[in-house]
From Swiss-Prot:
Its EC number is 2.4.1.-. InterPro entries: Glyco_trans_8, GNT1/Glycosyltrans_8, Nucleotide-diphossugar_trans. GO terms for cellular component: endosome; Golgi apparatus; Golgi membrane; Golgi trans cisterna; trans-Golgi network. The chain crosses the membrane at residues 32-54. Residues 598-618 are annotated as: Disordered. GO terms for molecular function: glucuronosyltransferase activity; metal ion binding. May be involved in the substitutions of the xylan backbone in stem glucuronoxylan. It is an enzyme of class 2 (transferase). The gene is GUX3. Substrate binds at residues 379-381, 408-410, 435-439, 489-495. It comes from the Eukaryota. This is Putative UDP-glucuronate:xylan alpha-glucuronosyltransferase 3. One of its GO terms (biological process) is xylan biosynthetic process. It is a single-pass type II membrane protein.
Length: 618
């Protein structure tokens, strides 16, 4: 007996039956459409061949974050509208490139076909010209993602990572001896913080750095805006004509730079840096600071020098001073170990006369210290608590983050160069500083910078939003002995040497209490006490400053400030040490409400030698 069919079997048979019916139907019409099908197949083959040729010449982009189609459209971020002066191009190439060595290949980035053909025509070179392919950066990669305001440096919650910019495709052959890249420059926007512009310059650098052997590699950047000054540096600039910039990069240094994170989204220096750093170029490296129009910073600079030597560093100490610093104070700086270099001040053209920032563009003079290959600049209100010589290993500009996408210029690695100095001067009337000072200006010039841990420029400051545990942590760091911090930066108007040593006088002024820390204050005075005794006299208090301190104390007493520092009796011996012609500071308080400024920046000294109780004023 044959078993009856199951429903499932019926469905299978129905499917098979329908398949046979369809096959017979197709066979009946097959002959009628055979010719038309053949034509369609031939057309498809031809279109496929054309598409393959097109893709071979212009490969598609593959960006995982947000795919960007290369196709028939161009990403507007990468469009470079600069007009190339071909006479300038021909002159530069013939004079500085082709006439000096044998070249095999020329890599071209972001140039269109017409520009490539024109380049071949004007240079009359037998080299292979290779249009190098670079995938566009994903559109969700912004400057803020490359330069975030904050990263988790200690990796408490996450390991910071940078967005990935596509790498350029570098051919094995021919050898690329000249790289040419055309850069966008939209001056209507933030051209100096342009992801595409950065991407193209890094791509050109990678092609140059991929070179093997000892032969020279040149890089030409076509840009109406100045290129990143610390990728291809001023020392490497061979020549410039109009918007054409020709560089001969140091390939070893370039490879080191390309190993760093693309932005400040990751640390360029490990949190636990090596304490013992050897450099073959130590004689060409120095710490540097600057004093202008501010003799009351002399004591701070002397203490900073002491702290550097206590950290174990033997690098040169260079201080730039202007004519407002007296001979007496300069003698103290020399005794502390500073090598003095005089300089002409540079006025900030946007500053109000006699304002605090009128002469702070004088910091640009650091780039004229060309007897050194690298310097670590420090503000004169810093202490170096642990050796930071290892920072000489890192490139310009290495610094801590400040806010938004910006770095703090209080401590930074600088590579002196006359051409970089000239760049700073050439743009002084065009580039606008976000804060009216040198830090804002430098941040507009050096937008590609490298983040170092905040422990290497730790600010003596309590933010309004700091939680109690954060304040406790900072307080512990300020007073740690042996130190945990590398560098402590004494922010605020009342510096430790302008207070009595008994406590931080910022406590007595309500608007300065965010800068008050007795622990940090004690740390500074430990360094002071370690100085040779003959240097202590440069930290004595003027009578006018004593009056200011007493005025502030009385105001705190009237306000019954809860911290209670105004109750502390002063034991600092400097209270009763007088070195001026007029020492009755108490009488100054009779009319102090009428003029309550210490005018520290405008102090003057007599040229006569000081006697034991008549030392010049700070």
């Amino acid at each position: 007996m044959i078993p009856s069919s199951s429903p499932m079997e019926s469905r299978h048979r129905l499917s098979f039956s329908n398949e046979k019916t369809s096959r017979r139907r197709f066979q009946r019409i097959e002959k009628g459409v055979k010719f038309n099908t053949l034509k369609l197949v031939l057309i498809c083959i031809m279109l496929g061949a054309l598409f393959t040729i097109y893709r071979f010449r212009y490969p598609p982009l593959q960006i995982p974050e947000i795919p960007t189609s290369f196709g028939l459209t161009t990403d507007p971020r990468y469009v470079a509208t600069a007009e190339i002066n071909w006479n300038h191009m021909s002159n530069l190439v013939e004079k500085h490139v082709f006439g000096r060595s044998e070249y095999q290949g020329i890599g071209l980035i972001n140039l269109n076909d017409n520009e490539i053909d024109r380049f071949k025509e004007v240079t009359k070179s037998d080299c292979d010209h290779v249009a190098l392919h670079l995938d566009y950066a994903a559109k969700n990669i912004t400057w803020e993602s490359l330069y975030p305001e904050w990263i988790d440096e200690v990796e408490e919650f996450e390991v910071p990572t940078c967005p990935s910019l596509p790498l350029i495709q570098i051919p094995g052959k021919p050898r690329i001896d000249l790289v040419i890249a055309k850069l966008p420059c939209d001056k209507s926007g933030k051209w100096s913080r342009d992801v595409a512009r950065l991407h193209l310059q890094l791509a050109a650098a990678r092609v140059a750095a991929s070179s093997k052997g000892l032969h020279n590699v040149h890089v030409i950047l076509v840009s109406d805006c100045f290129p990143i000054p610390n990728l291809f540096t001023g020392q490497e600039l061979v020549a410039r004509q109009g918007n054409i910039w020709l560089y001969k990069p140091n390939l070893h240094q370039l490879r080191q730079k390309l190993q760093l994170p693309v932005g400040s989204c990751e640390l360029s220096v490990p949190l636990q840096a090596k304490d013992n750093f050897y450099s073959a170029g130590a004689k060409k490296e120095a710490y540097a600071t600057i004093l202008h129009s501010a003799q009351f910073y002399v004591c701070g600079a002397i203490a900073a020098a002491q702290s550097i030597r206590m950290s174990g560093s033997t690098r040169d100490l260079v201080i730039l001073v202007d004519e407002t610093i007296s001979e007496y104070h300069k003698s103290g700086l020399v005794a502390a170990g500073w090598k003095i270099q005089m300089f002409q001040r540079i006025r900030n053209p946007n500053a109000v006369p006699n304002a605090y920032n009128e002469w702070n563009y004088s910091k640009f003079r650091l780039w004229q210290l060309t007897e050194y290959s690298k310097i670590i600049f420090i503000d004169a209100d810093m202490l170096i608590l642990r050796n930071i010589d290892f920072l000489f290993e890192f490139p310009e500009i290495s610094a801590t983050g400040n806010n938004a996408t910006l770095f703090n210029s209080g401590l930074m690695v600088v590579e002196p160069s006359n051409s970089t100095f000239q760049l700073l001067m050439d743009n002084i009337n065009e580039v606008v500083s976000y804060n009216g000072g040198d830090q804002g200006y430098l941040n507009e010039i050096f937008t590609w910078w490298h983040r170092i841990p905040k422990h290497m420029n730790f600010l003596k400051h309590f933010w309004e939003g700091d939680e109690p545990e954060i304040k406790k942590m900072k307080t512990s760091l300020f007073g740690a002995d042996p130190p945990i911090l590398y560098v402590l930066h004494y922010l605020g108007y009342n510096k430790p040497w302008l207070c009595f040593r008994d406590y931080d006088c910022n406590w007595n002024v309500d608007i300065f209490q965010e800068f008050a820390s007795d622990e940090a204050h004690k740390t500074w005075w430990r360094v002071h006490d370690a100085m040779p005794e003959n240097l202590h006299k440069f930290c004595l208090l003027r009578s006018k400053q004593k009056a200011q301190l007493e005025w502030d104390r009385r105001q705190a007493e009237k306000g019954n400030y809860k911290d209670g520092h105004w109750k502390i009796k002063i034991k600092d011996k400097r209270l009763k040490t007088c070195f001026e012609d007029f020492c009755f500071w108490e009488s100054m308080l009779w009319h102090w409400g009428e003029t309550n400024s210490t005018n520290n920046s405008s102090t003057t000294t007599t040229s006569s030698p000081p006697h034991k109780t008549a030392l010049p004023s700070l």
